[in-house]
Amino acid sequence: MVGGCSSLSYSSSSTFIATTTLSSSLKLNPQSFIFHLNLRKRPPLRCLSSLTMESPKPILDFEKFDDGFVQKLVYDALVWSSLHGLVVGDKTHQRSGTVPGVGMMHAPIALLPTPFPESYWNQACEVAPIFNELVDRISLDGKFIQDSLSRTRKADVFTSRLLEIHSKMLESNKREEIRLGLHRSDYMLDEETKSLLQIEMNTISCSFPGFGRLVTELHQSLLRSHGDHLGLDSKRVPRNGSTSQFADAMAKAWLEYNNPRAVVMVVVQPDERNMYDQHWLSSVLREKHNIVTIRKSLAEVETEGRVHEDGTLTVGGQAVSVVYYRSGYTPRDYPSESEWNARLLIEQSSAVKCPSIAYHLAGTKKIQQELAKPGVLERFMDNKDDIAKLRKCFAGLWSLDDPEIIKKAIEKPELFVMKPQREGGGNNIYGDDVRENLLRLQREGEEENAAYILMQRIFPKVSNVFLLRDGVYHKDQAISELGVYGAYLRNKERVIINEHSGYLMRTKVSSSDEGGVAAGYAVLDSIYLN
């Protein structure tokens, strides 16, 4: 989640994908989380039994396009991006993250949409409201959150500080009557099992709801202009309402708070090159809903903020109705006690938090791993069909206190990803580094184990793509990750919004393990349904 949950966390190497004779390789069964030999002899795993699972089919023969035509596409894409605000701050310009309009450049993008089977797309959209409801129910179970993360807090200082705030809220019996969640659930299509598998559920600072819509509209525009030559139909790129739906959810939360003079506060990093994605939401709030937004860092909140006796949060003298975090998800956002004081201050107020500390913790890696255990989903959900839909999308997830799993991961590290309790690109551990870190933890003792989980490594299909960065295109083999946004708003027992809210496609070269867009690993993309 650099700049907000934006890490493309699970990757493939094209050499692995090309290998088709690994019949005796160690494979992972995401349904039962048990190792099997000769998995290729087993029937394909299915996320929904009614779906006919198929791999994305190539939609273009890239070899037939000459450089002149591709350069025309590139030129049109760059012009469109500049005219429509699909831009980021140029990291070579000192003030590009602090002064709007200074040092802008186009966002990294895929030149054309990536093929994606319509059945998987429908499935990802269908489960989004179920995941929204699950997060809300987890947030109400303080004991589950504290117990699940009890060992993690001893090994991870950042998680420990978040849990301290959560504990204080539990001790004060403070209840969040108005609860707003703007989430994103990330998936990859596993080529081996022909399954849609969830990578993670992001509950804080989910980035690119502004750019997700824009890159979709860019691709639709290019296909309307060049679709005949490309052999593509712009109508096969699904509409993306991420910007308006997130803004609408914040506006309805603002209305529920019922203070027409209050503002929405966006909590930001002091130097934010991705500010324009954030400004799109503020623009919709202002122009469509007549709601004022302010932007403050956590340090500024600590200096200017105050919680009044009635619970009202004021910052710089302005009452705040909704707090929308686009920072606060990484230890780097808390360089001093001032930032932690600000986080606690916000939590103690009556403002609607997006997310609350409980929602934030519900999206941690360890909670995700706990939910994969047999019987845990049933603690929060009654509908058996909904439980089945969620569970069948889970990849293999394990804690590091299972000696058999540790042994398997040391023997076959290429089949695992080692994940710390961190959000953002560049944190996960792959390949031989998995083995080395597991051996290190064995030497140093078990206490540090709780800072990590192990996850099945997902191997998606490799496609040929044009990647556009710094005004230059490159043709490469790449893999993609689909993130489906979800909006959830509740006031006491009344559910006001529970819906999927657009999507974010990210694509990166298949030879790279990490893939955060803001971290420089991946590009923004959209999908072409086939």
From Swiss-Prot:
Cofactor(s) listed in the protein's UniProt record? Mg(2+)
Q: What is its EC number?
A: 6.3.2.3
Query: What superkingdom heads the lineage?
Result: Eukaryota
List the pathway annotation: Sulfur metabolism; glutathione biosynthesis; glutathione from L-cysteine and L-glutamate: step 2/2
Q: Where is the transit peptide?
A: 1-52
**Binding residue positions for substrate:** 184, 204-207, 272-274, 278, 326-329, 506, 517-518
Which key words tag this protein in UniProt? ATP-binding, Chloroplast, Glutathione biosynthesis, Ligase, Magnesium, Metal-binding, Nucleotide-binding, Plastid, Transit peptide
Q: Which SUPFAM superfamilies match?
A: Glutathione synthetase ATP-binding domain-like (SSF56059), PreATP-grasp domain (SSF52440)
Q: Which GO terms describe its molecular function?
A: ATP binding; glutathione binding; glutathione synthase activity; magnesium ion binding; protein homodimerization activity
Q: Cofactor stoichiometry and binding? A: Binds 1 Mg(2+) ion per subunit.
**Coiled-coil intervals, chain numbering:** none
Subcellular location(s) of the protein: Plastid, Chloroplast
The primary location reported for this protein is plastid
Give the enzyme's main class according to its UniProt record, as a single word. Answer: ligase
Single GO cellular component term:
cytosol
Binding-site list for Mg(2+): E200, N202, E423
What this protein catalyses is: gamma-L-glutamyl-L-cysteine + glycine + ATP = glutathione + ADP + phosphate + H(+)
Relate the assembly described in the record.
Answer: Homodimer.
**Protein family per UniProt:** Belongs to the eukaryotic GSH synthase family.
Q: What is this protein called?
A: Glutathione synthetase, chloroplastic
Give the organism the record lists: Brassica juncea
Q: What is the lineage of its organism?
A: Eukaryota, Viridiplantae, Streptophyta, Embryophyta, Tracheophyta
